[in-house]
Amino acid sequence: MAKGKDVRVTIILECTSCVRNDIKKESSGISRYITQKNRHNTPSRLELRKFCPYCYKHTIHGEIKK
């Protein structure tokens, strides 16, 4: 029997520097990654360093709402 809330949830990580530099219009989009996290181990928002193809470097990607 399954419980109401799953422990492992799917989240979206979005590049924080692309969002801040939206005024420049140098980048043609916003880098997003889809991953999973365990609610019990990481109850706060997740931030990971991932490669952004629009910034051409490794930047911090933060968790966003769906």
Curated annotation (Swiss-Prot):
Gene3D superfamilies registered for this protein in UniProt: Ribosomal protein L33
Subcellular location: Plastid, Chloroplast
UniProt KW keywords: Chloroplast, Plastid, Ribonucleoprotein, Ribosomal protein
GO molecular function: structural constituent of ribosome
InterPro entries to which the protein is assigned, alphabetical: Ribosomal_bL33, Ribosomal_bL33_CS, Ribosomal_bL33_sf, Ribosomal_zn-bd
Family named by the database record: Belongs to the bacterial ribosomal protein bL33 family.
Name by which UniProt lists this protein: Large ribosomal subunit protein bL33c
Phylogenetic lineage: Eukaryota, Viridiplantae, Streptophyta, Embryophyta, Tracheophyta
